[in-house]
């Protein structure tokens, strides 16, 4: 077995499509087995962005298996700690260990100034993009600690975790919070040889970003913005 993470197991949230799928496939290419979760359903009735589906998660599963790697996949909401823990525990029992946590799941909604953001949009955003990250790490990190072999945790923040943009204040707050989680987990888990980092993507060609609502948000100067206008 060859590859940079050969013999490792990675837990990835939001793995049905987009960045989560790309992480799963890339890690599998480098020799890792995968525990993959995604809600595969709307986060709330107010969600404007089409959600990932069970078929999307099945496609991720097939892509990993076609690379000769094992995968445990389940439909799980990152807001549900008990469900997350159950899947991680089952995955570790089946795959034998856990080395990497990739807390990637996230949503986009709204598009109002903070003083006009609805309580529902605010709550959904914080529950998924901030609390969901914390719950994902909390559910999985005991395995890294108990193994005593270190490990790696990657939290998906955003360029919005480094600076502010108008009309996305709840998203900005959540992603800045992810940076706080990263820094705190890093100082708390360093004694176990576990390193913790955040990544900060900008515009990414995924369904979460390349949709009518988001394109209109970022290009209000255009009547009908398209993907080319987002470059």
Across the structure, where does each feature detected by a protein language model lie?
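Residue(s) in the substrate-gating loop at a strand-loop-helix junction
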Residues: 158
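Active-site helix of classical SDR
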Residues: 137, 174, 182
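Canonical Rossmann dinucleotide-binding motif of NAD(H)/NADP(H)-dependent dehydrogenases/reductases
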Residues: 3-41
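Active-site loop-to-helix junction immediately N-terminal to the catalytic Tyr of the SDR YXXXK motif
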Residues: 117, 164-172, 184, 212
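Substrate-binding pocket helix/loop in short-chain dehydrogenase/reductase
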Residues: 112-114, 118-126
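Alpha-helical segment proximal to the catalytic Tyr-Lys
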Residues: 142, 187-191
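The beta1-alpha1 cofactor-binding region of Rossmann-like NAD(H)/NADP(H)-dependent oxidoreductases
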Residues: 54-55, 75-87, 119
């Amino acid at each position: 077995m060859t590859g940079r993470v050969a013999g490792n197991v990675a837990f990835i949230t939001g793995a049905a499509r987009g960045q989560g799928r790309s992480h799963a496939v890339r890690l599998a290419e480098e020799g890792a087995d995968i525990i993959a979760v995604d809600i595969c359903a709307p986060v709330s009735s107010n969600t404007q962005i089409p959600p990932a589906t069970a078929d999307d998660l099945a496609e991720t599963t097939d892509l990993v298996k076609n690379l000769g790697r094992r995968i445990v996949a389940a439909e799980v909401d990152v807001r549900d700690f008990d469900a997350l823990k159950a899947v991680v525990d089952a995955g570790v029992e089946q795959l034998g260990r856990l080395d990497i946590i990739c807390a990637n799941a996230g949503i986009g909604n709204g598009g109002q100034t903070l003083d006009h953001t609805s309580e529902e949009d605010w709550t959904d955003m914080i529950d998924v993009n901030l609390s969901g990250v914390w719950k994902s790490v909390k559910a999985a990190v005991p395995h890294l600690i108990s193994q005593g072999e270190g490990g790696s945790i990657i939290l998906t923040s955003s360029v919005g975790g480094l600076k502010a943009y108008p009309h996305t204040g709840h998203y900005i707050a959540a992603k800045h919070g992810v940076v706080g989680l990263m820094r705190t987990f890093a100082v708390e888990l360093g004694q176990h040889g576990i390193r913790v980092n955040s990544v900060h993507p900008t515009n990414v060609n995924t369904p979460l970003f390349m949709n009518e609502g988001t394109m209109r948000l970022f290009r209000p100067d255009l009547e009908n913005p398209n993907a080319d206008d987002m470059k």
